[in-house]
Amino acid sequence: MRWLSAASSAFAVVLWLSGPPFAIGPLVFIALVPLLAIAEVSPSSSWKRPLYAASLAYWLLSLQGLRYAHPLMFLPWIALSGYLAIYPVLFIALLRRLRLVDNCDVSQARRDRVPLCLVAAVVWVGLEWIRNYFFTGISVLMLGHALADMPMLIQIADLGGTYAVSFVIVCVNVAMFDALNRWVVQRTSSVSDSPMKSLVTAGGLLIATMVYGAMSMNAETEPTGKTIALLGDNELTVYEQDIVREQEIFATYGQMAIDAVAKSNTRIDAVVWPESMFSGGLPWMTTGADLVVPDFMQNPAAAPLQPEQLRFAVESKQNDFLDRANSIQRAMRASSTVPTEAPPAIIGGCGLVQYADRPSQYSGVVWVNATGNMSGTYSKNHLVLFGETIPLVHSLPWIRDIVPPGLGLDRGTQPERFDLDGISLMPNLCIETAVERIPVNHMHQLNSRANPKLPDAIVTLTNDVWFHDSAVVDHHLRCAQLVAVGCRRPILSAANGGPTVWIDSAGRVVERLAKGQSDVIYAQPRRDSRISLYVRIGSWPAGLMGAATLCGLAWMTFEWLMRRRKRSVIA
């Protein structure tokens, strides 16, 4: 039991050291070695409990920044960590089932047929694919993210996303385990292959990864000739925020935008405000053709409010919204030291409200063009579980009564593209870059339209101040780096208390604001004309591994049920 606890702890500690805050990336190539050692223990050993406990500690420590968002987030933080801690246990259980059977001849035949490094990589990537989709999905701390600061090794993400990087890492871990087991420990393993077989397989994959990475990083890109100002500050926000505080935040960012233009030696084409910072107590409102006045707007003591009256009121609010935005634009133009005929466009995180057959509210992005008109909006497609949406909150009154206001947002359904003069941008919001499939699917959908046109860059607006400069902010950044490679597009991130950063299409950080720093980044993204294989076909290769893994889990569950039934019959 002590040996199992030590091995489980070693796995958790090494994996934790490979990522933020220490970020010793190369350690990830040996992080799974203790896990593979656990896979060899006898069936009667109690390996699951210590492994789960160590995995739980790893996730609690890695995601501890979540608890700062709200007192109620302690339970979701623990629940999410408890859920994610299951995956290493499932990995070992599947690996043992696939490589160890009662019939030794069959086991040997299996080992001769498929190298362990490939079996382990398929299982691990399959489990990563499952957690990217199950329970709304989360990509944070995939194995491949540990190499985010080693650009040459992550370029294969444009072939298969972070899954491809994780696949290679697992293969190298198995090769290290086989070599250590055979030549250092000097004993025959019940699950591992000949060390030469795994070393050749993993070495070949690693060399191919490096060659492909070197070639990809030298691909030609061209300047867009455009400058995008990314605002970054650390304005404290709370769930139950009053309108006065929202207006204070708006005023602060408004002054930042004006100062950013004044300090620039080049013409600013657009200024990007972080998530929610452009609302200022006044969301952008629209109405639909099938407009129905909501019941909460009706006053029993007065005449019923008619749809035409509501439409007029919304149009009045739209004028107020644009007047406010135009005042910021006029001030930016007046402060500019560079001659310009038009002010910068504004891309801002802002609440969206639509009145149609029912009222809908979204966390969104607005684009006010250089002429002061509303040119486009984006409604967030992926809501934060427990942060923006809670399962059954509308069905169970006792849940609805204890959660703070604002946790009932609606979900957008499609990507958008903002075609500014000379540059096209695809907006993403909040943690959407931390759920890899969201931006990749958006790119795929844009590429699959009747008149396909991909954006020149992805602009992401986020508010990570909730996490108090913890490692969660760094995890978010690493997700964005891998997304940049997977989509082959620069990522321009404007954040409140988070990663305000300019990332190129090779996943390299060109410029980043330090944690706690209030400043602006003048991003001049380069145009990368490549359309990655990952964007073209999506994650179906990893999906096949996920399907195979699900079949394995289903078969293990079936066998467990049969054993229980057999024991109950005997009893």
Swiss-Prot record:
Pathways per UniProt: Protein modification; lipoprotein biosynthesis (N-acyl transfer)
TM stretches of this protein: 13-33, 51-68, 72-92, 118-138, 152-172, 199-219, 542-562
Coiled-coil annotated spans: none
GO terms, molecular function: N-acyltransferase activity
GO cellular component, one term: plasma membrane
Pfam families: CN_hydrolase (PF00795), LNT_N (PF20154)
Major enzyme class: transferase
Keywords annotated in UniProt: Acyltransferase, Cell inner membrane, Cell membrane, Membrane, Transferase, Transmembrane, Transmembrane helix
GO biological process annotation, one example: lipoprotein biosynthetic process
UniProt-listed SUPFAM superfamilies: Carbon-nitrogen hydrolase
Active site: E275 (proton acceptor), K380, C430 (nucleophile)
Top-level division of the source organism's lineage: Bacteria
Main localisation: membrane
Keyword Transferase in record: yes
Topology of the protein relative to the lipid bilayer: Multi-pass membrane protein
Annotated HAMAP family: Lnt
Entry similarity comment: Belongs to the CN hydrolase family. Apolipoprotein N-acyltransferase subfamily.
Protein name in the entry: Apolipoprotein N-acyltransferase
Organism in which the protein naturally occurs: Rhodopirellula baltica (strain DSM 10527 / NCIMB 13988 / SH1)
